[in-house]
């Protein structure tokens, strides 16, 4: 009889213990699934997962940020020609393309069932409501010279502040090395020119390359001062493109029109008469790295370009 009572008591205790264990696991799973943080962005305040697992990123500079922070997105926008950029391609295996930066594919995004979407107000404000209906959505503000601000924002959103601080410190160390090693070159007035289909632009202070040159300490020609974005010029204003050194880059979409514009202008007698051209100080650089990609990986590669040219004595 005593054995029977003891067995009954032990069985009851085991059952209670198992139920409690199951209850705790259920509670833990629920808490884990529902744990969110409030993030304030340019669109307001949003509740997002504390540690998102399935992120869709809608800007190319954002793609670079995520990869640098150790976060592989489930979906990302492609480069302007519909392919991954060469400098990030190897890290994007198995990532699903979701359209281009200026025209994300909402159906492709929804099919991935993301738990977080990261976009940009300048690019995606018109589809914000639709994105928000798919998953929690946050936006950086603009895409111009503010890549560092955006990078810090992405690090905050992804709960990767330590990784972000480390990456920026490494970038700034490279900047400081150039400043130190080539301090006698910092008075060089650098001109930035971009050729596009039907357009020629001078890139000013509030551009990706412009902010990096300023951070290093390089000067700009008198015609390229200030913090504006770009000046579009015709050949009658070619003198504004002159400088001690010129870096030019061409926005080519695969139809040959950007390259045709470059060829036309480079062969023009007025262009050839610029002092920077006559002194053989006009250098073509990669448009993706110096402008279009616009992220931390491109920034580091631009520094590498400058460092290499300086060490080779090109300017």
Description of each model-found segment:
Residues 1-9:
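Bacterial N-terminal signal peptides that target proteins for export
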Residues 5, 18-34:
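Bacterial lipoprotein signal-peptidase II cleavage site
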Residues 11-17:
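Bacterial N-terminal signal peptides
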Residues 54-66, 165-219:
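Basic- and aromatic-lined ligand-binding clefts that recognize polyanionic substrates
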Residues 61-108:
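A short, structured surface patch at a secondary-structure boundary
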Residues 113-118, 136, 243-244:
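Proline-aspartate-enriched helix->loop->beta-strand connector
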Residues 126-197, 293-315:
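Extracytoplasmic substrate-binding proteins
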Residues 245-315:
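Structured C-terminal subdomain patch of bacterial secreted/periplasmic proteins
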């Amino acid at each position: 009889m005593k054995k029977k009572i003891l067995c009954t008591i032990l069985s009851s205790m085991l059952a209670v213990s198992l139920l409690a264990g199951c209850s705790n696991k259920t509670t833990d799973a629920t808490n884990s699934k529902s744990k969110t943080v409030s993030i304030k962005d340019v669109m307001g305040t949003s509740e997002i997962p504390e540690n998102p697992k399935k992120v869709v990123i809608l800007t190319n500079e954002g793609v670079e940020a995520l990869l640098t922070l150790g976060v592989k997105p489930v979906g990302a926008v492609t480069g302007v020609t519909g392919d991954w950029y060469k400098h990030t391609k190897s890290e994007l295996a198995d990532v699903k393309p979701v359209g281009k930066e200026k025209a994300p594919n909402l159906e492709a995004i929804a099919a991935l069932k993301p738990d977080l979407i990261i976009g940009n107000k300048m690019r995606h404000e018109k589809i914000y409501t639709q994105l928000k209906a798919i998953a929690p959505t946050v936006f950086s503000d603009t895409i111009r010279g503010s890549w560092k601000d955006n990078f810090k924002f992405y690090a905050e959103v992804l709960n990767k502040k330590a990784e972000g601080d480390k990456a920026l410190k490494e970038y700034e160390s490279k900047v400081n090395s150039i400043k130190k090693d080539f301090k006698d070159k910092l008075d060089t007035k650098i001109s930035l020119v971009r050729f596009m289909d039907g357009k020629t632009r001078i890139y000013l202070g509030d551009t990706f390359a412009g902010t990096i040159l300023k951070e290093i300490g390089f000067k700009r020609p008198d015609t390229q001062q200030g913090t504006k974005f770009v000046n579009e010029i015709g050949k009658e204003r070619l003198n504004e493109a002159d400088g001690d050194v010129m870096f030019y880059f061409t926005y080519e979409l695969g139809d040959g029109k950007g390259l045709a514009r470059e060829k036309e202008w480079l062969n023009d007698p007025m262009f050839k008469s610029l002092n920077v051209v006559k002194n053989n100080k006009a250098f073509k650089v990669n448009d993706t790295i110096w402008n279009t990609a616009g992220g931390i990986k491109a920034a580091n590669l631009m520094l590498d370009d400058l460092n290499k040219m300086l060490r080779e004595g090109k300017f």
